[in-house]
């Protein structure tokens, strides 16, 4: 059975007049599942080059079909990442401001029209199904965790008029315990506060990096007015109090202005509040259900600092965070859920990688692309790519590294990465100036040989693999000065372990770098500038290489 999961908006890239605001329909993606197994998955932004694309992911759908060698007629079910009721409500809301829109205001009718228009064939409307948003998040985590049983927490801004749920996963089933209304949205809570720091939607991860520079105690009493912890894992948010309480105390930062001590303290207090609320919920349901494993998904689960605190807390034996925890991951969850309902269950083996996107092609295909850029670039084949790249990095070079299929989700995990020596602290500012043009406080992540991670980082007992760069952990005290480029101001790093079995070419590069430089770690950041999404194709990589200050491009 072929099932196609879909997230994103209900309009094409050229249909701007009726666009639903991106905050409602972001991170468009398509995921193709065959008999419970992921065949292909890609975010629309990688193909249309629009960050957090809210368009109907027609290019992603085309990619998935092409990769499988399938036709649209071969898809048994199209699984959309929200309920039909919610989608219809968004269309009706849009109609209030755009009465010239044609009727009927039916999400299924719109989706059917988009698919039939693009692929020029009739599609049975019964093949289009809608999935509860947070259940899609939850399934995306539990179904791929490898756990037989687990507590599951899905939390985000909002979707389907809710902001999260708690469930218990047991073997092939997922049983909901409680849902959180929009009034308890931790995503909205975070967003409402960061506007005082000069940030908005999709900037939440930046504040996570700013928080260690501040003192949470400065505003702790103020934040106590914004939320309260209740018995049995419940909590209340008082979002209406945020602006009146902070406006007299905080000067709202404008874009380009420096961060004041107030802004840093506010970020620290916000991060502390989020962690307190989530741990309060988890402590209760850990005790009430007896579940010893935890799965996390939803946009809030991309808060890697929070994830690290959960891992260190010892509440759970094992913690799995869906690497595509944002709404693109709902395309994955929706497809998995619908496949399961039709008797096709994923393997209970834990997820080891998310290299499900575009392949860069054969050596001949790569050479053909590079030949098209002659006059702007020169290139040659290397007899030992890993060794030569490692030697260049050890000598101070910053390289673009592109290989294999692209990653699904927001992290570059060794297939679409910018890499450098993790030792000189000056490399942080150098790469920011060269490529990223981003805030200087934001840390870079390390990729480390899986078998040596414990030499450099404080890895909780029982944890051996951290393949998705989604936990912030402590750098060992004696290694912090050595790893100056990847150690944050609070002595932490967002750790990515690399397995020889899962990504042999990247592992070989890090091993070669260890032989050159004495450390089995490299600095790894996503291969993009501060405007575009992560590169997907060789063509994308060449363009980014030419428009930044990278020293070398390795393909």
Locate each region found by the language model:
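Flexible beta->alpha loop and helix N-cap segments adjacent to enzyme active/binding sites
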Residues: 2, 9-13, 17-40, 47-51, ...
């Amino acid at each position: 059975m072929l099932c196609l999961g879909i997230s994103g908006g209900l309009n094409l890239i050229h249909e701007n007049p009726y666009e639903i605001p991106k905050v409602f329909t972001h991170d468009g993606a398509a995921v193709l599942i065959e008999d419970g197994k992921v065949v292909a998955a890609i975010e629309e932004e990688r193909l249309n080059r629009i960050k957090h694309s809210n368009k109907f992911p027609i290019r992603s759908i085309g990619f998935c079909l092409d990769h499988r060698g399938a036709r649209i007629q071969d898809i048994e079910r199209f699984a959309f990442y929200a309920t039909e009721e919610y989608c219809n409500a968004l269309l009706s809301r849009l109609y209030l401001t755009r009465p010239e829109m044609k009727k009927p205001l039916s999400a299924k009718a719109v989706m059917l029209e988009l698919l039939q228009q693009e692929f020029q064939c009739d599609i049975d409307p019964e093949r289009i199904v809608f999935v509860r948003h947070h259940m899609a998040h939850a399934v995306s985590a539990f179904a791929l965790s490898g756990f037989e049983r687990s507590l599951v927490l899905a939390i985000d801004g909002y979707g389907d008029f809710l902001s999260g749920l708690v469930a218990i996963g047991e073997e092939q089933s997922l049983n909901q315990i409680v849902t959180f209304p929009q009034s308890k949205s931790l995503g909205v809570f975070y967003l409402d506060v960061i506007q005082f720091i000069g940030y908005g939607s999709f900037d939440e991860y930046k504040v996570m990096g700013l928080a260690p520079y501040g003192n949470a105690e400065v505003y702790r009493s103020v934040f106590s007015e914004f939320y309260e912890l209740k018995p049995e894992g419940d909590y209340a948010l008082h979002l209406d109090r945020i602006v009146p309480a902070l406006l007299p105390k905080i000067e709202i930062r404008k874009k380009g202005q420096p961060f004041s001590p107030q802004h840093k303290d506010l970020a620290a207090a916000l991060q502390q509040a989020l962690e307190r609320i989530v741990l309060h919920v988890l402590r209760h349901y850990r005790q009430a259900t007896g579940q010893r494993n935890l799965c996390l998904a939803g946009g809030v689960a991309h808060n890697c600092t929070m994830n690290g605190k959960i891992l260190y807390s010892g509440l759970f034996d094992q913690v799995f965070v869906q690497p595509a925890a944002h709404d693109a991951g709902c395309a994955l969850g929706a497809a998995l859920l619908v496949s399961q309902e039709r008797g096709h269950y994923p393997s209970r083996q834990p997820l080891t990688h998310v290299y499900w996107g575009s392949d860069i092609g054969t050596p001949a295909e790569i050479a053909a692309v590079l030949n098209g850029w002659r006059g702007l670039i020169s290139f040659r084949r290397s007899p030992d790519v890993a060794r030569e790249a490692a030697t260049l990095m050890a000598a101070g070079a910053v390289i673009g590294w592109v290989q294999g299929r692209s990653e699904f989700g927001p992290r570059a995990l060794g297939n679409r990465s910018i890499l450098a020596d993790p030792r000189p602290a000056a490399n942080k500012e150098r790469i920011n100036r060269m490529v990223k043009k981003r805030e200087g406080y934001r840390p870079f992540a390390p990729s480390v040989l899986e078998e040596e991670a414990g030499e450099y980082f404080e890895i909780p007992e029982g944890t051996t693999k951290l393949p998705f760069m989604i936990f912030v952990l402590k750098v060992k005290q004696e290694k912090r000065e050595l790893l100056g480029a990847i150690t944050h101001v609070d002595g932490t790093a967002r750790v990515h372990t690399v397995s020889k079995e899962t990504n042999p070419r990247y592992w070989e590069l890090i091993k070669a770098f260890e032989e050159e430089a004495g450390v089995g770690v490299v600095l790894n950041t996503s291969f993009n500038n501060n405007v575009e999404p992560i590169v997907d194709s060789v063509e994308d990589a060449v363009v980014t290489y030419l428009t930044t200050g990278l020293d070398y491009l390795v393909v």
